[in-house]
Amino acid sequence: MDRSEGMDTLENSMSGGMSMGMSMGGHQGHPPDIKPDISSLTSPTSTHGGYYGFGPGSMSSMSSSTQPSPGPQQMHSPGMHSPTSSMGSPPMLCLSPTGPSPSPGLPHSSLHTKHICAICGDRASGKHYGVYSCEGCKGFFKRTVRKDLTYACRDDKNCMIDKRQRNRCQYCRYMKCLSMGMKREAVQEERQRVKEKGDGEVESTSGANNDMPVEQILEAELAVDPKIDTYIDAQKDPVTNICQAADKQLFTLVEWAKRIPHFTELPLEDQVILLRAGWNELLIAGFSHRSIMAKDGILLATGLHVHRSSAHQAGVGTIFDRVLTELVAKMREMKMDKTELGCLRAVVLFNPDAKGLTAVQEVEQLREKVYASLEEYTKTRYPEEPGRFAKLLLRLPALRSIGLKCLEHLFFFKLIGDQPIDTFLMEMLENPSPTT
């Protein structure tokens, strides 16, 4: 079968076959109007930290502009624990993010270590900066020191830092790193040793950009950007419109991912896992950025404008307002461009903590390359804004929190007849991309 025939077959199998179901919660503080049977939903795993390598706490210079994100207990839906499908009927499938695994992935060589991380209690990958620690805490400490970041605690500076909650407060996590013996000078000495090796081995963000070109990331964004000049106000229920837009965008999301540098070089099973883990945040980031031009609402890929008042009437006003204030408004305020959006979405895509991932180390390295390329881009493109890179990263915890909250409202059933989402993603990834 040639490429065009393969695409036609795939499109025919998908047309009219995507059905969605969902349950919308009521206003905050009230039980949802409809309780779906979620006994057989697949479950997102725990929301412990390390998801982006830093937590939702803000730097002191921006602490007044960021809003608290709910902790793991607040964001976890009680009905979304690991299920066992009933034998009487096919299980309903929730496209919930696979999320971080109970034990974040480490390089295979470290799996047999008997040490645990002194900071969060996770499995240690070795001794880093004087202390046995995991890759997540090691990376967090290194970034904090190298970028000379300053954090603020929203509570009383004694937050619990463990494997599940290490990402909740950056301030307390950093202080625990210091109290357990991590040495700032060890990070600085490490960087100096690298520089002394010579120009060919100097750590370089421009080198990272060569391997993770932002130009290619921008091309991926532009390739799937809906070409819509005018938007019309939605007439139907906003939830229905959002579901239909998500339905449509799930297909383009796969094509977007295949254009991100090195994604298709990963094992096919890992590609499925990464898309399944991040689909909701990736879609939310996309329509939030598209909505920068909207007034008091969001713009969907289907060409519809969903107004804030409609969302409140439908009972989803609280989460809708969070999207507008924590994502859309912040993106508008800093004039986030599409290259920056693409890089943030690539950070979400390359999630080394996704459950079941085999190429953990490779995915971690790809995420680090995206960070480095984004930092280099912001320094070059916006030299008058030295804090822009950090400001961009502060949108990630909000995106994560909102993504989890949305899953408490929207439950998507199986797609394409009886095929589960993993099968759908596998077919999309195996199918050659259409030529452009």
From Swiss-Prot:
Record keywords: Zinc included? yes
UniProt keyword annotation of Nucleotide-binding present: no
Regions of biased composition (Basic and acidic residues) lie at 188-200
Annotated region described as Modulating, given as residue ranges? 1-116
Annotated keywords: Cell projection, Cytoplasm, Developmental protein, DNA-binding, Membrane, Metal-binding, Nucleus, Receptor, Transcription, Transcription regulation, Vitamin A, Zinc, Zinc-finger
Point out the DNA-binding stretch(es).
114-189
- Where mainly found? cytoplasm
Q: Pfam families, from UniProt? A: Hormone_recep, zf-C4
Where do Low complexity bias regions lie?
Answer: 13-22, 57-75
* Span of zinc fingers (NR C4-type): 117-137, 153-172
What are the record's GO terms for cellular component?
cytoplasm; growth cone; membrane; nucleus
| Subcellular localization | Cytoplasm; Nucleus; Membrane; Cell projection, Axon
Which tissues and organs express this gene's product?
Answer: Expressed in the adult central nervous system where it is detected in neurons of all central ganglia, the neuropil and nerve bundles radiating from the brain (at protein level).
GO MF: nuclear steroid receptor activity; retinal binding; sequence-specific DNA binding; zinc ion binding
Q: Which PROSITE patterns does UniProt cross-reference here?
A: NR_LBD (PS51843), NUCLEAR_REC_DBD_1 (PS00031), NUCLEAR_REC_DBD_2 (PS51030)
Q: Which residues form the NR LBD domain?
A: 209-432
Provide the residue span(s) of the region labelled Disordered.
1-108, 188-209
Q: Which InterPro entries match?
A: NHR-like_dom_sf (IPR035500), Nucl_hrmn_rcpt_lig-bd (IPR000536), Nuclear_hormone_rcpt_NR2 (IPR050274), Nuclear_hrmn_rcpt (IPR001723), Retinoid-X_rcpt/HNF4 (IPR000003), Znf_hrmn_rcpt (IPR001628), Znf_NHR/GATA (IPR013088)
What's its membrane topology? Peripheral membrane protein
Q: Sorted alphabetically, which PANTHER family does this protein's record hold?
A: NUCLEAR HORMONE RECEPTOR (PTHR24083)
Q: Which family does it belong to?
A: Belongs to the nuclear hormone receptor family. NR2 subfamily.
**Functional note:** Ligand-dependent transcription factor probably involved in the retinoic acid response pathway. Binds 9-cis-retinoic acid. Involved in embryo development, in particular eye and shell formation. May play a role in growth cone steering.
Record remark on domains = Composed of three domains: a modulating N-terminal domain, a DNA-binding domain and a C-terminal ligand-binding domain.
Protein name as catalogued: Retinoic acid receptor RXR
Please report the organism this UniProt entry assigns to the protein: Lymnaea stagnalis
Gene that produces this protein: RXR
